[in-house]
A protein has these predicted regions:
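Conserved nucleotide-binding and Mg2+-coordinating catalytic segments in signaling enzymes
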Residues: 362-377
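Short terminal alpha-helical segments
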Residues: 10-14, 18
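Regulatory sensory/coupling modules that transmit signals to nucleotide-handling catalytic cores
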Residues: 1, 17-31, 36-43, 48-359
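TPR-adjacent "capping" and linker segments in tetratricopeptide-repeat scaffold/adaptor proteins
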Residues: 1-8
Length: 377
């Protein structure tokens, strides 16, 4: 996005957002509010889209679901109007992740497909890689392993043409880790081995902590299926010792959930509860009932395994209450999606109409006013 046309104050706000988005949430949110307010005053969809997007990104990192959904849906509308396609695709990606977490894979897939379409239309290969990897994870969640592999492999093929991109190594780890997990879940353990070896190649210790923990989770599942108790438990302890108190819960929930399912089959109860104690408050804070239900299901499995009947019944009662509330949430989510799609469709129709009108005017300007013949030969 280019911002040279704006005054010094606006450019300073934008610079502050981009420089601090990973380190200072309060400062970024304050600048985003200023940018949105100025954008409203000047009827500037580009500024409003920018402010809503980066504000939404911060709320995503803070696990603040209510503000995230509002900001990101607003961002999508304004960015589409401003024709800022890279951020439009990133909006679709965020909303796809959130919809999947809410338990609506069909809606998530719709967001991802729109993101893929715009990635192809506007030649955005790195954004396409991002969408393809998350589509692969969606298929993985749904047990569509062939589709999952194909999506990951398509992302890999594009990635090989972008080896100098700053995100190349990040996406390579995502590809190898997710492919390994996909193969492991199908019990194709020998095929998964070379992917795991890549993840542990020289220098992997320099990978970000969250990514190292993801690799440890894949190792836990792999060694559990291999029956290697010692290596499995070593990986479990790595997670237990290094798990931070705060995670971006939507980015990692499915991985930790699958890890917990493995832990329920072991005697590693302390590590199981360590993970639950970290993810549960963040899931509650994000206000995604579907994930709260999954956490409760882990607790119920544990209580049943250890014959803790009173705790099991209490959790079951809460599970029932949340299930009823989740139905209303799903209806509201679909209603919001329908409204958003109508708004985007209306804007795109208006844009196409304007483009056709401009084309007609251009053709007329290129014709002799007397003969109506083209002046260009």
């Amino acid at each position: 996005m280019e911002f040279n046309q704006y005054n010094t104050t606006v450019q300073q706000w934008i610079h502050t957002v981009l420089e601090n988005r990973e380190t200072n949430a309060d400062v970024v949110l304050e600048c985003c509010r200023d940018i949105i307010a100025y954008g409203r005053e000047t009827d500037d969809p580009k500024l409003m889209g920018f402010g809503f997007f980066y504000g939404g990104e911060i709320y995503y990192e803070l696990n603040d679901g209510a503000h995230f959904f509002h900001m990101m849906t607003e961002a999508l509308t304004y960015l589409d109007r401003a024709e800022e396609w890279e951020l439009v695709v990133r909006c679709y990606n965020f909303l796809g992740i959130a919809s999947m977490s809410r338990g609506n894979p069909s809606l998530a897939l719709d967001y991802y497909m729109n993101g893929l379409k715009d990635s192809d239309t506007y030649d955005l290969p790195m954004q396409k890689i991002m969408i393809l990897i998350n589509m692969g994870l969606l298929y993985l969640e749904c047990g569509h392993y062939v589709d999952s592999e194909n999506s990951f492999l398509e992302a890999y093929q594009i990635l090989q043409t972008k080896q100098k991109d700053e995100k190349y190594n990040f996406y390579m780890y995502a590809f190898y880790g997710n492919m390994a997990e996909c193969l492991i879940l199908q019990d194709r353990l020998q095929e998964a081995k070379p992917y795991l070896e890549y993840l542990h190649k020289d220098g992997w210790e320099q990978v970000a902590l969250t990514d190292r923990l993801f690799i440890d989770i894949v190792d836990v599942i792999y060694y559990h299926k291999m029956g290697d108790v010692q290596k499995r438990n070593e990986s479990i302890q790595m997670i237990h010792q290094n798990l931070p108190d705060n995670l971006t819960v939507l980015d990692f929930f499915s991985d930790y959930y699958r890890c917990c399912l493995v832990l329920l089959e072991t005697d590693q109860d302390e590590s199981l509860w360590r993970i639950i104690e970290v993810i549960e408050p963040q899931v509650v804070n994000f206000k995604i009932i579907n994930l709260q239900l999954k956490v409760l299901s882990l607790k119920m499995k544990f209580y049943r395994k250890h014959n803790q009947n009173a705790e099991y019944l209490q959790a079951a009662g809460l599970y029932y209450e949340l299930s009823e509330r989740n139905e209303a949430v799903t209806r509201n989510m679909l209603s919001s999606m329908i409204t958003l799609r109508k708004n985007l469709e209306n804007m795109r129709k208006a844009r196409m109409k304007a483009e056709r009108k401009n084309l007609v005017l251009q053709e007329r300007s290129e014709q002799d006013p007397l003969t109506r013949l083209s002046l260009i030969h």
